A protein has these predicted regions:
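Compositionally biased, intrinsically disordered linkers/stalks adjacent to structured regions
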Residues: 158-180
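A structural "domain/chain start" motif
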Residues: 30-82, 90, 132, 142, ...
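Bacterial N-terminal signal peptides
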Residues: 19-30
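Bacterial N-terminal signal peptides that target proteins for export
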Residues: 4-21
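Surface-exposed short loop/turn segments
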Residues: 37, 44, 79-84, 89-90, ...
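Tryptophan-rich substrate-binding surfaces of secreted polymer-degrading and adhesive proteins
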Residues: 1
C-alpha cells in the first residue's frame, strides 16, 4: 500500500509565512529594547534641559566657531536624547559653556629648520547643573587639531572647522551623558 504525500493548502503555507514573519518582527522589536544605539545614560526622572549659548571668550576669536558649535550641540542633544528644551531656570539639566582657549602653535617636529605641522588647540569650559540632585559639575573639554605648517591660520580654520565642532560636541556629550 502506497502512502500518499500530505497535501498542503495554500492557506497553510501562507499561515506559516505569517507566523515566521511575526516571530522575526517580535524578536527584532524586543531586541531593540535591550540594546541602545548610543551610550546616553539619563535618569528617567530628567525631562527638561536648558542649553545656554556657548560664548567665545578666547583671546583669539574665530567668528564661525561659537555659532556652529551651538547649532551642532543643540542638534546632538535633540537627536540623541528625549529631553525637552526649555528656557526656564527650573529645567532638570542646565548646561552652559564658554570657549576659553583657541590657540595655534608649532609642533615639535622640525624639518629643515621649519615646523612641518602646526597645532590648533580649542578648549571649552562647561558648567553642568543637575537641579534634581542639586549638583553642579564644571569641566574642560579640550581638543588639538594638527594642520600643515604651509597653511595660514585662516586656511586651516576653514579646513578644520567641521572636525573641531564635531569632536568638541562629541566630547561634551560623552562627558555629560555617557559618564566618560
Amino acid at each position: 500500500m502506497k502512502i500518499s504525500p500530505e497535501i498542503k493548502s495554500p492557506n497553510m503555507k501562507l499561515s506559516k509565512v505569517y507566523s515566521i514573519l511575526f516571530l522575526v518582527a517580535t524578536l527584532t522589536l524586543t531586541s531593540c529594547g535591550i540594546y541602545k544605539f548610543n551610550d546616553a545614560s539619563i535618569d528617567p526622572a530628567v525631562k527638561t534641559i536648558k542649553l545656554g549659548f556657548i560664548e567665545n571668550r578666547a583671546r583669539y576669536v574665530n567668528p564661525q566657531l561659537s555659532p556652529k558649535l551651538n547649532d551642532k550641540w543643540q542638534l546632538k542633544i535633540a537627536s540623541q536624547t528625549k529631553l525637552t528644551r526649555t528656557t526656564s531656570d527650573d529645567a532638570h539639566y542646565i548646561i552652559s559653556g564658554t570657549i576659553t582657549n583657541y590657540d595655534a602653535s608649532q609642533t615639535v617636529g622640525v624639518s629643515n629648520q621649519q615646523a612641518s605641522t602646526n597645532r590648533l588647540t580649542v578648549t571649552v569650559h562647561i558648567v553642568f547643573r543637575n537641579t534634581l540632585s542639586n549638583k553642579t559639575e564644571e569641566f574642560d573639554v579640550s581638543r588639538s587639531f594638527d594642520f600643515d605648517a604651509n597653511l595660514t591660520l585662516t586656511q586651516a580654520e576653514a579646513r578644520l572647522l567641521d572636525e573641531m565642532v564635531r569632536s568638541l560636541t562629541d566630547d561634551m556629550f560623552n562627558r555629560i551623558f555617557s559618564n566618560w
